[in-house]
Amino acid sequence: MLGGLVTALRTLTILPIPGKDAVTFSHSLYWFPFVGLLLGALLAALGYVGSLSGWHEFAALLVVLGGIVLTRGMHADGLADVADGFWGGRSKEAALRIMKDPTVGSFGALALSGVMLLKWVAVVRLLSFGLFDVVMAGILLARLVQVLLASALPYARREAGTASAFVAGAGAPHAFSALLFTLALLFPFYTENFPTMLWLLGAALVAGSMVGMVSYRKIGGVTGDVLGAGSELTEVAVWITGALLLSDYLLF
């Protein structure tokens, strides 16, 4: 069982983790929410330390860049590849071929720049109100969405790829367990503000569903790049939602 945790940590972070990987990589999906909580706590702590100076813009930049560093830029790279492939390839084969190209095209650069800017703007707002729990929640819910996408959709490539071993054995038990685990991890932070947790969860599920639907229509399933893009888009959706909940002009 702990092999799944080792695999999840090695896959999702740069942390040097001793131990043996899971024999079946899909077993690591059960641990994705826990790794999301760990990453979220580290980034929230980084944001807190940065905010002590009162310079929330710089603290937010630390959070955004810290997320890239701690994940080896893997999810950000996936977002860029998906943007290039989905909007640059007219057929499934063309999209998959473009996504495999290591260079970043114009669509990828625009998507990456836009998402990172939105993240930064949202995190500035969250940190200025001391909402470190929402920063953490975005990271945690993004890993839940990765499990849901891997469990709900088939692997899109004919040949094996980075995520094929995770997607191959994934199914409803992984999705259901990850959802329950995520709720259990989030609930202690929102016992006095349960509606906020529901809004954040809803934002994550909407973002994940949209990624899944677009990916299924475009390439017939998911790849590692799609899982990475789903993570990035979920983070920004949750953080933007959290920032909007602070607005005096919106009645939630």
From Swiss-Prot:
Pfam families: CobS. GO terms for biological process: cobalamin biosynthetic process. Keywords: Cell inner membrane, Cell membrane, Cobalamin biosynthesis, Magnesium, Membrane, Transferase, Transmembrane, Transmembrane helix. One of its GO terms (molecular function) is adenosylcobinamide-GDP ribazoletransferase activity. It comes from the Bacteria. Pathway: Cofactor biosynthesis; adenosylcobalamin biosynthesis; adenosylcobalamin from cob(II)yrinate a,c-diamide: step 7/7. GO terms for cellular component: plasma membrane. Belongs to the CobS family. NCBIfam families: cobS (TIGR00317). PANTHER family: ADENOSYLCOBINAMIDE-GDP RIBAZOLETRANSFERASE (PTHR34148:SF1). Joins adenosylcobinamide-GDP and alpha-ribazole to generate adenosylcobalamin (Ado-cobalamin). Also synthesizes adenosylcobalamin 5'-phosphate from adenosylcobinamide-GDP and alpha-ribazole 5'-phosphate. This is Adenosylcobinamide-GDP ribazoletransferase. The gene is cobS.
